[in-house]
Each structure stands twice: as structure tokens, then as C-alpha cells.
């Protein structure tokens, strides 16, 4: 055909554009091969993407460990935080699953990172995504080969943690775990031929861990002082198998079917001694054994139809999940006058079904996407307390509880892009009907629930200052619904004198977010900067309180009124030479919690008042990537977290350094690596909490230092 010039803006936001019909004049001649090449950006204004293989210092560990080196991400108490908040929605391959939690975050510290290809961070999600998670979304993408034929990867890593004692035990209790082993074999297989692609992934992560070694000093207004230690030796074995197939039924239709089965076995052996203020008298020794088995099974089926117009697609997906938690606790309560034996058994079965329909229509200057989603979630929980002689368990607080939620939703999202302007505007409307039915004989709580129909808009306006500079303005509204464990009515006794209890009267937390971001690129680097402000209504948090005549502390979830988070984030990347690249991430923010008053119902009604709290916090993360001759690569990461605000108190500063080295062997098919986390063993978690007539300071000397070695081979 004769050449024809038709100017248009390709942009970066849409893979396909509708340019209409372009009429060409025929002119038969041979054409040379046309090659389109390019490299995907890792840091974009709307999404940050990170390959797990580049995270050398955390290779062979868990997904949680792999994520703590990423810009804007911190970890605390086994959860991810984005910009200081743990209200994060975690997806696997774009979907919520019981493996990582539907409402909160679970098991991230036990899922092997060896099965993961990349991790995506979205701070301001569009209406296409579910509305929960005010801090943003983390999408974990499993590995899937795209080469034809049979190929795969095998790997084996091992390590040791708790190499030396951070702090000695109080006298008279069992030893801490030391020299804790970590073993992670992994296998990935893929066969692609013609219209069929088959895939299989299997991983096993076995670890022993000094999971908790917390020393708490409690001070009461009446002059009493209690010193305690909570030491938890944990043994975990987490196994997963994922398999499936992609079938190209025709040139326009693809069917994908996959399933995942996982088991997580946890054994916790704990000791909790309680002393007077001078440590001259042991008042009590609480020992426990937790035997827990978690079983997860998921099934996914998806149909994708490609219309004749390129990029116009219809996707229909069905996801079903079953997740069982089978917990057995055994307690020994050693008092000066007697020894008591207690136990309980908890069985929780989670059933979730999701159906979604998504449609994408390319436009000349962008695209339109819309869809519907329906979720049904049902969780019956049975708690059976078995009190012994002189029992301290609240046996009347057991029984059945049934959690049920129904969520239909629909959304529309419009994307426009020209040579200077980008617009993304969307609206998601969700209806939620949640009920929580409890045992009618429960001494404190009654059945509860809520329902609402709410809009969740999102807006992004961007101006391209130049080819290397873009300015973006964001707004979105999101919700964090209480998870089932947040409203669970059964007291938890893994800490005998700081008891955690849920609250069925909890209501959703709503967040409005405003952000102004800028990205400036140059030849060998870039600067990403943003200023953000979040306003939270009905903030969900735990409130610590006491009741008259008792030194026991009850941690109960409550809606604590309004809170605010205002901050600035910077990500600077610079390739300083052919062998070294440095990334510096700085995140500073101010947390404010307004004054509030709550009424705790458990174990008896009591009122708690808190004054306004205000604290400036943040974190600094320096990451160096080094490329040496003979296929040798290295990584060094240093992380500092400033003191941070929590309702009723604060957490203190923390610091750690991680490092790793890997070498390619066997003509690039093999790889050896060695790494170490928290090299200097400096990481401690220290908190201060103030209540109505008490305060306590806790410092956790849990295991953070681990050395690993491993080998991977591709075929």
C-alpha cells in the first residue's frame, strides 16, 4: 500500500486505541520485517511494578520479607503498611483470596516468595477494583512461563535465624529458639503448545522462628507494677500447589481454569511469666501450646472474548474459595497456690464466591471500562472452651457465631489521553449487607450487622509538562469494612493478661484521599514525588482498657472517630555507573487522631476517653543494586523508621540493614545466592500505650536476623 500519515497520540494508559477506518491505496511490494521494541517502566504515576528476582537480599524468604524492601512499604506485626497504614488490599493475580485475606492481611509471612514473579503497588486504585483498602492495593503476580514447549524451574534454599540471643529470658521458663532452620524447595512447570498452556507450581516453606519475645512493663496509677515476658517459639510448614490451563478455544476466545490448594501447619509453644516490679517475686507463669492447621482451596474459571476490534474485550470470571482454621489451645496456669489446666478449640470455615463481568472498549483517545461484581461470603465459627479447675477462661463467652456478607457492585471508568492531558474518572457503587449472629446466651454481645449503598468515586488529572515530566492530581474515596476477626466475640488468651476481643458493633471506616504527584525522568534516573492527605471517619483501632478491681488489660476493636494522615513521598533513582544503581525512598507524614470517647462492653461496660494525638513520623529506605563481572549481582538495603503514632500511644524508631549476593552459573540457567536480613541484629519493636489508669511499655526482641543460601535452575 502507499504510505499514509495519520497523526495520533499513542500515550501510555491504553494498550489499544480506536482510530477508526484508515483507507490505504494499494501498491503491492515486499516489506521488511517490522520490529516494535521498548522497556516497561517500573515506576509509573498510577502503579509501581517490582520483579521479585531483583530483590536479592530477600531471596528464599516469604512474600512479606520480599516486600519490605520496596519503596513506600514497611512491615509491622506480620502486616504490610503503605505510607504508615496497614489498611491494604492484597490481591493474588488480581483477585482477593483466603490465602492473603479478604478483609485483612493473613499468612504473608509464610507464603514463599519463590513462587512470585512480580509485585504491583497501586496507591490510588480506580473504580475497577473493590473499594476496600484505604492505603492502596498490592497485587502479587504468580509466575507463568510464556515460552513454547516444556520448561520450568526448580529451586532450593535454606537458612538459619536467631543466631544469637537479643535478650535473655526471665528466670524459670523454657529456652528461646536459637539457630532456627528455614527450608524452601520449589518447583515450577509449564507446557505450551498450539492452543493449550498447562502450568504447575509447588512450594513448601518450613521454618522455626522465635516469633515473639516481648518484654512488657505495666504501671498502674495505684502504684502496682507488673513485669512480664511473652516468648513464643513457632514451627510452621506452609505448602501450596497451584495448577491450571489456558485454552485458546478460537482466535477470539480464551478459557482459563486454575486451582490452588494450600496447608499451613503452625505449632506455637509459649511461656509468659509475670513478676512484681523488682523481679523478686514471680506471681504467675502462663504456658501455652497452640496447634493450628489452616487449609485453603480455591477454584477459578475465566472466559475472555476478543471482539474484532482490537482491544475490545469481555471478561467473565468465577472464583470460589474455601478456607478452614482449626485451632486447639492448651494452657497451663501456674500460680503460687495451684496449677490450672485449660483448653479450647476453635473451628472456622470460610466460604467465598465471586462472580465478575468486565468489559473494555477502546476509544480514539483512551478507553472505557465497566463491569459488575457479586460476592457471597459466609463464615461460621464455633468456639468450645474447656475450663479446668480454677479456670481463668471466660467459658460463657464461647459458642457459635455466623458471619455473612453479600456485596453486589457495579463500576464504570473512563480514560482519556492527549499529547498534554490525561484524565481518568470512575465511579463504583457498592451495596453491602452484613450480618453477624452470635449465640443468644452470650453474656456480653448480641447479634449485630449493617447495610449500606455507597458511591466510591476516583479521579486523576495529569498534565504532561514535557516528555520527561508529568504532574498528576488524584482523588478517591474508599472503605475499610471490619474483618470477621475484628468483630469476633471470643476472647483470645495467647497473652494471659492483655486479652484481645472483637466487637460486633464495629462499623466501616471511610477514607477520602487527595494526592498531588510529579515524575521527572532523565537519562539514567528519575525523581518521583507526591504530597498526600487522607481523612478517615470512624477510624478502626484497638482500644486498651481496664475494669475496676483488676489489672487485666482488654484490647477491644472500636471506631475511634476521625483521624488524618498528611505526608510527602520521594523516590529517587540514579544509575551512577554501569555497575551501580541507587534508589532512595523518603516518606514523611503527620498522623493526627482526634479526641474520642468509646464505650467498651467487654467484660463489663466501661467508658474510655482519649485526648487529641499528633505526631510526625516517616521512614527512609536506601537500596543499592550492583552488577559485577561474571554474572555476579549484589544488593544492599538500609531501612529507618521514625517513631509513629497509634491511638493511646506510639511506636519507637527502628533500623535494619539487609544484603545479598547472587551469581549466574551453568550458562545462565543456574543461580546461586546468599543473603542476610538485619545483619547487625538491631531491629526491635518498642511501643508505649496509655490507658485510663495505666500505661505500659513493650519491647519485642523477636527473630529478625536470618542468613540464607539457595540454588535455582531453569530448564
Predicted regions and their residues:
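Outer membrane beta-barrel strand-and-loop segments of large Gram-negative receptors
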Residues: 352-356, 397-399, 403-404, 503, ...
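C-terminal extracellular loops and terminal segments
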Residues: 119, 560-564, 581-653
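Face-selective signature of the C-terminal outer-membrane beta-barrel domain
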Residues: 240-264, 288-439, 464, 468, ...
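Periplasm-facing N-terminal accessory domains of Gram-negative outer-membrane beta-barrel systems
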Residues: 1-33, 74
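Conserved "repeat-terminator" motif of extracellular CCP/Sushi domains
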Residues: 19-30, 38-40, 140-145, 596
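Membrane-proximal, glycine/serine-rich, low-complexity loop/turn segments characteristic
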Residues: 10-11, 15-16, 39-271, 290-322, ...
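Extracellular loop and loop/strand-boundary signature of outer-membrane beta-barrel proteins
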Residues: 171-175, 224-231, 282-289, 338-345, ...
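Outer-membrane beta-barrel translocator domains and adjoining extracellular loop/strand segments
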Residues: 165-170, 211-223, 268-280, 326-335, ...
Amino acid at each position: 500500500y502507499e504510505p499514509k500519515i495519520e497523526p495520533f497520540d499513542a500515550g501510555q494508559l491504553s494498550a489499544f486505541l480506536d482510530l477508526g477506518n484508515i483507507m490505504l491505496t494499494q501498491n503491492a511490494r515486499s516489506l521488511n520485517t517490522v520490529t516494535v521494541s521498548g522497556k516497561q517502566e517500573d515506576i509509573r504515576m498510577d502503579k509501581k511494578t517490582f520483579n521479585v528476582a531483583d530483590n536479592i537480599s530477600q531471596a528464599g524468604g516469604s512474600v512479606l520479607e520480599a516486600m519490605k524492601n520496596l519503596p513506600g512499604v514497611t512491615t509491622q506485626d506480620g502486616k504490610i503498611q503503605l505510607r504508615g497504614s496497614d489498611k491494604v488490599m492484597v490481591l493474588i493475580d488480581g483477585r482477593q483470596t483466603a490465602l492473603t485475606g479478604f478483609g485483612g492481611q493473613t499468612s504473608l509471612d509464610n507464603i514463599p516468595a519463590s513462587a512470585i514473579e512480580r509485585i504491583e503497588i497501586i496507591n490510588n486504585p480506580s473504580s475497577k477494583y473493590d473499594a476496600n483498602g484505604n492505603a492502596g492495593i498490592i497485587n502479587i503476580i504468580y509466575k507463568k512461563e510464556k515460552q513454547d514447549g516444556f520448561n520450568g524451574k526448580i529451586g532450593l534454599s535454606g537458612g538459619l535465624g536467631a543466631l544469637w540471643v537479643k535478650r535473655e529470658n526471665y528466670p524459670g521458663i523454657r529456652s528461646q529458639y536459637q539457630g532456627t532452620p528455614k527450608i524452601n524447595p520449589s518447583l515450577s512447570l509449564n507446557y505450551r503448545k498450539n492452543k493449550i498452556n498447562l502450568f504447575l507450581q509447588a512450594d513448601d516453606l518450613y521454618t522455626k522462628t522465635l516469633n515473639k519475645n516481648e518484654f512488657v512493663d505495666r504501671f498502674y496509677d495505684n502504684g502496682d507494677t507488673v513485669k512480664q515476658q511473652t516468648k513464643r517459639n513457632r514451627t510452621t510448614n506452609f505448602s501450596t500447589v497451584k495448577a491450571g490451563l489456558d485454552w485458546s478455544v478460537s482466535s477470539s476466545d480464551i478459557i482459563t481454569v486454575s486451582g490452588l490448594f494450600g496447608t499451613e501447619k503452625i505449632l506455637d509453644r509459649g511461656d509468659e511469666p509475670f513478676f512484681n516490679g523488682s523481679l523478686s517475686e514471680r506471681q504467675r507463669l502462663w504456658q501455652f501450646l497452640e496447634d493450628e492447621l489452616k487449609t485453603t482451596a480455591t477454584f477459578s474459571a475465566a472466559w475472555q472474548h476478543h471482539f474484532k476490534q482490537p482491544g475490545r474485550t469481555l471478561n467473565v470470571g468465577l472464583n470460589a474459595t474455601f478456607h478452614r482454621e482449626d485451632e486447639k489451645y492448651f494452657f497451663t496456669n501456674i500460680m503460687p497456690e495451684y496449677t490450672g489446666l485449660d483448653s479450647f478449640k476453635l473451628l472456622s470455615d470460610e466460604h467465598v464466591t465471586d462472580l465478575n463481568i468486565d468489559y473494555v472498549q477502546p476509544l480514539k483517545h483512551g478507553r472505557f471500562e465497566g463491569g459488575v461484581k457479586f460476592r457471597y461470603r459466609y463464615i461460621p465459627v464455633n468456639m468450645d472452651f474447656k475450663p479446668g479447675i480454677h479456670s481463668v477462661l471466660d467459658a460463657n463467652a464461647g459458642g457459635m457465631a455466623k458471619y455473612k456478607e453479600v456485596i453486589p457492585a457495579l463500576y464504570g471508568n473512563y480514560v482519556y489521553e492527549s499529547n498534554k492531558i490525561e484524565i481518568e474518572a470512575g465511579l463504583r457503587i457498592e451495596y453491602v449487607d452484613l450480618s453477624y449472629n452470635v449465640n443468644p446466651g452470650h453474656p456480653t454481645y448480641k447479634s449485630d450487622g449493617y447495610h449500606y449503598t455507597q458511591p466510591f468515586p476516583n479521579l486523576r488529572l495529569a498534565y504532561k509538562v514535557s516528555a520527561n515530566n508529568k504532574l498528576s492530581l488524584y482523588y478517591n474515596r474508599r472503605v475499610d469494612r471490619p474483618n470477621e476477626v475484628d468483630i469476633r466475640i471470643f476472647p483470645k488468651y495467647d497473652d494471659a493478661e492483655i486479652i484481645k476481643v472483637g466487637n460486633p458493633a464495629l462499623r466501616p471506616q471511610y477514607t477520602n484521599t487527595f494526592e498531588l504527584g510529579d515524575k521527572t525522568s532523565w537519562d539514567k534516573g528519575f525523581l518521583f514525588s507526591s504530597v498526600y492527605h487522607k481523612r478517615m471517619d470512624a477510624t478502626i483501632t484497638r482500644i486498651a482498657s481496664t475494669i475496676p478491681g483488676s489489672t487485666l488489660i482488654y484490647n477491644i476493636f472500636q471506631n475511634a472517630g476521625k483521624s488524618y494522615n498528611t505526608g510527602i513521598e520521594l523516590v529517587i533513582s540514579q544509575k551512577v555507573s554501569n555497575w551501580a544503581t541507587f534508589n532512595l525512598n523518603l516518606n514523611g507524614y503527620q498522623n493526627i487522631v482526634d479526641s474520642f470517647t468509646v464505650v467498651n462492653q467487654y467484660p463489663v461496660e466501661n467508658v474510655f476517653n482519649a485526648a487529641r494525638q499528633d505526631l510526625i513520623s516517616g521512614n527512609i529506605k536506601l537500596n543499592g543494586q550492583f552488577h559485577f563481572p561474571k554474572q555476579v549481582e549484589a544488593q544492599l538495603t538500609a531501612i529507618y523508621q521514625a517513631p509513629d503514632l497509634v491511638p493511646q500511644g506510639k511506636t519507637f524508631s527502628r533500623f535494619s540493614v539487609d544484603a545479598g549476593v547472587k551469581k549466574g552459573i551453568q550458562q545462565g540457567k543456574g543461580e546461586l545466592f546468599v543473603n542476610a536480613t538485619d545483619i547487625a541484629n538491631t531491629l526491635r519493636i518498642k511501643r508505649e500505650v496509655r490507658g485510663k489508669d495505666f500505661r505500659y511499655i513493650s519491647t519485642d526482641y523477636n527473630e529478625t536476623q536470618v542468613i540464607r543460601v539457595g540454588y535455582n535452575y531453569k530448564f
